[in-house]
Amino acid sequence: MKKSVMLCLMAGGIWMAGAADVAFRRPVIVPEPVELTYEAGQPVRLDKHMKLVVTCPDPSAAAWVSRMFGEWYGFVPRVEIVKEAAAGAKGADGYVLSARPDRIVLGGNTLRGVKYALYTLRQAAERESVGRTLKGYWLPALDIKDTPALDFRGVHFCWFPENSATFIEHQIRLAAYYKFNYVVLESWGVFKSERHPYLAIKDAPLTVKEARRLSALAADLGVTLIPQFNIFGHAAGSRSMGGKHITLDVHPQYQPLFEPAGGWNWCLSNPDATAVVREYVDEMHEAFGRPPFFHVGCDEADEPSCPTCRAVQPYAKLVEAHILAVRDQLKARGARIMMWHDMLLERGDKRWRPFYANGSKDEAKMAETLPRDIVICDWYYGNNYGGTSEPKSYSTLDYFKGLGYSTLTCPWNDPKGIVVQGRYAREAGLFGMLETVWHHFRGNRFATMMETAADAAWGAAPNGVRRTNPSVGSRPFAVHWRQIGWDMGISDYAETGFYDTTVTRDVLDR
C-alpha cells in the first residue's frame, strides 16, 4: 500500500523533496574555506520557519542578516542574536558557519565576519529539486571554520568610458561576495569633478553623487572603495595605444597643464598644474567618503619634454616634491597614499630582472627617501608580460619590504602566477595582495582571474570540482555573477553574462 501511494505521488508530480534521497555535492565556495565538512545526505532548508542564530558582538549584525535574507530569498527568518565573540572565529574577518535541519548558526567577531559567513551560506545553497518554478533553497548540513591569511585583499578595477555604471556596480558587488575587503577604482576620465570638469568626458557617469552611493553600497557589503587618480604619468586618462587624451582632445586651452610630448605626464614645473592635481585629489577623496587609502598611480611616466621641467636637474626633485605634497595633503585627511612601484627602480638594473623597472637613476633614489607610510603596489604579471609564473625569488618585493614599506604584490591574468604571488605574500609577511584586472573584465579570463585571486588572497586552494570543471558556464563564477544580477534587478540583455553580446556582428555576417 505504501509503495502504491508513493508511486501515485510521483506520477502526480507532487513528490516532496524532503522524502527523497539526496546526495549533495561538496559545496563550491569562492574563496575556498580553510575548514569545511558536510553531510551529503542531510538537507537543510532555507525557509521562513528556520531558526537562525547570529553570534557577534556587534548588535547590528542581526538586522543586516535579516535584510539580506529579505532581499535574497523574499522572507525573514527567526533571528536570535548572541552578543559575544564567536567561538572558533579568528580575527576581524574570520567566521564560523554551522547548518543543521533545526538551526543555522552564523558567527563572527565583527559585522564583516558575519557578512562573510552569510555570503558562504548563500553560495552553498542550491534551488530545491521540485516543481516548475522555484519553491525554495536547500544545502547540505555542514560546518565551516574560516579565516583569511592576508589582511589586505584587494582588487583593482578600471572604470573606462565604455563601461556602464551598472557593470561597475556588478564588479564591486562581486568583489565583496568573494571576500575582498578593498576595491581600488581607477577613473579613466569618468569622474565628473565639479571643480575641474574638463578632466572627464562629457556626461561622465562617476559623479560626486554616484561616488558617494557606490562607496556607501560597498561599505554595506563589507568592502572599502579606494579611488585612484594618476598624479604623474598616465595623465591622458586613456590607454597610450588608443591615442586619446581625455582633456586635450576637446579642451586644447588646458595644454599648459601637461607635458608637450603627447600630454602623457602632468607638467610638474607648472604650479598651476600641480595645484589642479591636488584640488582634484581632494575632491575625489571627499566624494568617496574619505577612505583610509588613495591610489596615486605614478607608473610608466615619460621623461620630461617640457623645457622648464627639463631645466630642473635632477627631474626627480620635481617628482618627489609633487608626490610628497599629495601625500601630506592626504595624510592630513587621514589617508595613506598607494603608488605603483616601477618608477622607484632604475630601468636596466639587472637586480630587478624579470621584474619591472621604469625609473631613472635619480628617481630610483626616491625609494630611500619617501615616507614609509606609503603603500607600494609592486605589479608583476608573470608569463603574460615577459616574465615567468614562478620566479626564483621576488627581489623587488623583498627590496621594498626591507626598506620598511607596506608592500602589496599585484598580479594580473596569469592564473599560476596569481597563486604563486599570493603564496609568497603570505609566506613573506607582505601587507597583502592587489589583483589587477585592467581591460580583461569580460569572459572566461575575467572569471578565472577573480576566482583564482580570491583564493590566493584568502589563503586556501580551490577544491577539485573547481579545478577540473572545463565549462565556464558551469563554474561557480557564472552562478555568482548571475546572483548579483538578481540583486541588482538587471534585465538588460547586454548587462547579463560575461559579454555584452553572444556573438559579434562580424560573426553574424560570415
Question: What does each of the following model-derived ranges do?
Answer:
Residues A19-K145, P354, K361-D362, W379:
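Acidic, contiguous N-terminal accessory segments
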Residues M1-S4:
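Positively charged n-region of N-terminal signal peptides that target proteins for export
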Residues G74-G88, R132-K135, V184-F191, C410-D414, ...:
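A generic structural motif
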Residues L97-M338:
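Feature activates predominantly on carbohydrate-active enzymes
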Residues T55, V82, Q228-N230, D299, ...:
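Short loop/turn motifs enriched for small/polar and acidic residues
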Residues S60-A61, E162-S164, A175, V190-E194, ...:
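Flexible loop/turn segments at secondary-structure boundaries
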Residues I29-E32, L36-E39, L46, V54-T55, ...:
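Substrate-binding groove of N-acetylhexosamine-processing glycoside hydrolases
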Residues C8-G18:
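Hydrophobic h-region of N-terminal signal peptides that target proteins for export
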